[in-house]
């Protein structure tokens, strides 16, 4: 079964790759998922995924941004589900590209934060967030789970920079927390999750999210009303049962004919209509209609008389 998060990523990978934004999106992929290794006496940069659409996206980003076609290696995992694994391997201009994307500094040291040119450009920020979500993001199905979207980071300062991007440019009210093996930024508000999906370009997924959210909220509202009605019915039934019990006690001990006329009329009516609510009794009692508070006052008098009879025994 395809998950909602998979649908979101499928839509994002189908978006056109714009040359002016490709580097920002690629920078997120390489910074978050890239692995530098040595093959055949030369450095290579590998990105591994089980999603073929994401592999194609990375391939297109590298080709668009730098005019280089990386290797695309497909293998089959031998454990568990035996899924296919896709490896995108960059072997040319590795150091130059990592330096250009500000993942390496001038001494070839790793820069774990997000470059200033992305932190100060709204359009680049949108592209970077798209790449970050594709690389290490997830979102719950709004129909069946609590509202939650998150992006994982290995490094704390990268996580903090993601938080700044999401809040300073787009006012998403994102939060950050530490996980056992890293850090996450996350969204819990349904409206903000919808905004994020729109920002990164998943417009269809955003519309589907809003539809599912509205349906879920409507169901919750209906359930609350049903629960409220059920509680009110139960309360009405319990109150009526106690009133009938009091009236039957009075009838047995002294007879209803010895009650004041208004109380006797109400007592007889309640015995024949135990299912009616207080409001319905007030409207239908033979000497009425009277106010709901008036009916309640009469039942209170009956209650006091029944209580007195119990105490006498």
Curated annotation (Swiss-Prot):
UniProt-listed SUPFAM superfamilies: Homing endonucleases
InterPro entries: Homing_endonucl (IPR027434), Sporu_reg_WhiA_N_dom (IPR018478), Sporulation_regulator_WhiA (IPR003802), Sporulation_regulator_WhiA_C (IPR023054), WhiA_LAGLIDADG_dom (IPR039518)
Domain of life according to the entry: Bacteria
GO molecular function: DNA binding
Alphabetized UniProt keyword annotations: Cell cycle, Cell division, DNA-binding
Annotation: DNA-binding region: 277-311
GO aspect biological process, one term: regulation of sporulation
Any Pfam family hit: HTH_WhiA
Disulfide bonds: none
UniProt record similarity statement: Belongs to the WhiA family.
Its job: Involved in cell division and chromosome segregation.
Protein name as catalogued: Probable cell division protein WhiA
UniProt source species: Lactobacillus gasseri (strain ATCC 33323 / DSM 20243 / BCRC 14619 / CIP 102991 / JCM 1131 / KCTC 3163 / NCIMB 11718 / NCTC 13722 / AM63)
Lineage, broadest ranks: Bacteria, Bacillati, Bacillota, Bacilli, Lactobacillales
């Amino acid at each position: 079964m395809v998950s909602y998060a998979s649908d979101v990523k499928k839509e994002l990978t189908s978006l056109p790759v714009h040359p002016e934004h490709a580097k920002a999106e690629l920078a997120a992929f390489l910074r978050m998922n890239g692995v530098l290794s040595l093959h055949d006496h030369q450095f290579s940069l590998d990105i591994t995924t089980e999603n073929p659409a994401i592999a194609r996206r990375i391939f297109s980003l590298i080709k668009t941004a730098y005019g280089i076609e990386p290797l695309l290696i497909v293998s089959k995992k031998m454990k568990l589900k035996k899924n296919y694994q896709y490896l995108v391997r960059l072997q040319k201009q590795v150091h130059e590209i990592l330096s250009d994307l500000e993942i390496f500094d001038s001494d070839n040291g790793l820069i774990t934060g997000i470059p200033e040119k992305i932190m100060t450009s709204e359009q680049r920020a949108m592209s970077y967030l798209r790449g970050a979500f594709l690389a290490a993001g997830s979102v719950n199905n709004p129909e069946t789970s609590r509202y939650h979207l998150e992006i994982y980071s290995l490094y704390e300062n990268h996580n903090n920079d993601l938080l700044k991007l999401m809040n300073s440019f787009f006012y998403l009210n994102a939060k950050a927390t530490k996980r056992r093996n890293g850090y996450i930024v996350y969204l819990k508000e349904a409206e903000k999750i919808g905004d994020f999906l729109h920002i990164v370009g998943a417009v269809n997924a955003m519309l589907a999210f809003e539809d599912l959210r509205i349906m879920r909220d409507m169901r919750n509202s209906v359930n609350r009303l049903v629960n409220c009605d059920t509680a009110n019915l139960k309360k009405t039934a319990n109150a009526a049962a106690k009133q009938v019990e009091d009236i039957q006690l009075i009838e047995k001990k002294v007879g209803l004919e010895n009650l004041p006329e208004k109380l006797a009329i109400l007592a007889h009516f309640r015995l024949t209509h135990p299912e009616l609510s207080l409001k319905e009794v007030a409207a239908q009692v033979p000497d009425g209609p009277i106010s709901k508070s008036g009916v309640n006052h009469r039942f209170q008098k009956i209650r006091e008389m029944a209580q007195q009879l119990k105490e006498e025994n």
